[in-house]
Amino acid sequence: MVLQTLTVRDPLQPFGFVDVLYYYARVAPLLRNFLKGKPLATKIHLPRGNIPFFLRRAHVDGPLKIDDLLTDVDERLLKLRVNALADVRGQLTEKQQRIWSYFVPRKLIDFFYATNGEKIGGSLERIYFDIDRKGVDVDIAQEVTAALLDAIAEDTQFRDVAGSFKFFVLWTGNSFHVYLLLKKPMPASFYEKFIAYTKDDPLRSFTGRWAAAIAKNVYQKTQGGHEKKQGWITIDPSQSPSGKLARCPFSLHVSDADSYDGIALPVDIMKLRGTTLIKDLKNYTPKTVLDHLDSFKRLLP
């Protein structure tokens, strides 16, 4: 049975127990282009014990792609997941067993992907900046995000070295990611030469120069880099290189093993300065996301 025709009361408990696979399989068709060829990854949260979570990713657990959720997840598989995997393994294909291991039933799971592939030193098809807001109001993060887009768009020197690109903005459930989707892939050295932030020479990179301009004109405690500081906005590009992970659109933003506090959603750039944007994004639930998939489709690359 095609999952798009299978409606349930609670997308995170489609058959009476927590199982996020139904929800992620339902949003998968919208992600085919954005995640084309990208290895998937998941962060599975554990309710007790010394290990709070574990990761599944391609180079350790075998590759999984977004199309696998379209072709191999059906109602039969979802109903089998009331059982232990060991008891039904013989009824599953090898790919379904891998999907099961990435999306373990009865667990809350963050949905990620390899930003520029798993292979270390691979080329860059996209660059993204995490707008980290440690202890800073989310409205300020929104303002900084809008200012970063303006700074990049107005930087002719950057366009000279990067070529054409498209913006994509993602609300992570807690803050924002700003993507530059490059028309022409760049070698791995492009990141180190032009994007990577260093404290010893902060204005060497475009990241540092943009952060400095925003600190001067928008929010004084804005910095570039990976190191998070209480009360500061950090513009962090460090998850851009190949081998690093990024949050998928529509991922739950899991706060602990028993709860999530937001959903990653595509943002209409034209509304990025809107006064109700954050409230509107926070009001979405998994069910209302599925009810409004058509409205999100136009916002995805």
Where are these predicted regions, by residue range?
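C-terminal, helix-dominated tail/subdomain
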Residues: 195-209, 236-240, 247
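DNA replication initiation on ssDNA origins
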Residues: 1-125, 188, 223-259, 269-274, ...
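Short, charged/polar micro-motifs that form catalytic or ligand-binding hotspots
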Residues: 134-142, 196-200
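Short, glycine/acidic-rich hinge or "gate" loops at secondary-structure transitions
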Residues: 159-173, 222-227
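Histidine-centered divalent-metal-coordination microenvironment in nucleic-acid enzymes
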Residues: 124-129, 164-195, 245-249
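Short glycine-/aliphatic-rich beta-strand segments at the starts of folded cytosolic domains
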Residues: 121-139
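A short, contiguous, amphipathic alpha-helix enriched in charged residues
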Residues: 138-158
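Long, charge-rich alpha-helical interaction segments
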Residues: 200-208, 212, 216, 220, ...
